[in-house]
Amino acid sequence: MTIDTLVAFAGIVFLLAIIPGPNALLILYTSLTQGKRFAVVNTLGVSVGFLIHAFISAQGLSLLLSQSAMAFSIFKWLGVAYLFWLGINNVKAALNQSELKIDPKKATLTPSLSSSFIKGLLTNLLNPKIVLFYLSIFPQFVSPQHLLEQSMLLGLTQAMVVSSWFLVVILFASKLKAMLTTPKVTKWLNYVSGGLFVSFGVSLASARL
């Protein structure tokens, strides 16, 4: 694999990264509601997801998944259910939020870094569109003689490119956070992000082989 080939692949994944999707929405929402640290851990989870996708693709499991309508359907609906779960949780958070007062005696539920990592990982892993992307793109960039090594290199490249873009998103969101942390704005942020997660789930439900 040449440097030119790697740069071409990096260009493709960058263009895909800047298109809003479930991963980007998760990072942006976490940045605005929980802070940079948790969003960075989200990003780490997403990045590990790309490496796992690359490994699975190199082992031929992605091809097997794409050739089995039942397996693809099960995988797809797991992804749909997960996006719906994220969306419904955000809407519930908005419904439960009090705009009038916050009782300081009540303990605040702080998300853990591990849960942030798992959210990023699952949002990426349970997306069959990424499986289809790897099946359509990887054969153009890897040679059969070095399938595993080159697939992992491409997965690492995608993880680095996407992470770099998400870090820009996180830094931008951190600048806006001071203006968006009032209870009223946070409530509507939960509503909007919840609706978007559900809409991504609906879009994913229409995915076909």
Annotate each predicted stretch with a short phrase:
Residues 92-112:
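Flexible cytoplasmic inter-helical loops of multi-pass small-molecule transporters
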Residues 126-139, 200-203:
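Kinked, hydrophobic transmembrane alpha-helices enriched for aromatic residues
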Residues 66-98, 162-165, 169, 177-209:
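Selective transmembrane alpha-helices of multi-pass membrane proteins
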Residues 7, 11, 110-122, 149-153, ...:
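Alpha-helical membrane-protein architecture signal
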Residues 3-73, 136-157, 171:
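Juxtamembrane transmembrane-helix termini in multi-pass membrane transport proteins
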Residues 21, 127, 194:
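Short, conserved phosphate/pyrophosphate- and ester-handling motifs at nucleotide-, phospho-/glycolipid
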Residues 45, 49, 53-61, 83-89, ...:
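Alpha-helical transmembrane segments and their lipid-water interface positions
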Residues 14, 18, 51-52, 88, ...:
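Hydrophobic/aromatic residues within the transmembrane alpha-helices of Major Facilitator Superfamily
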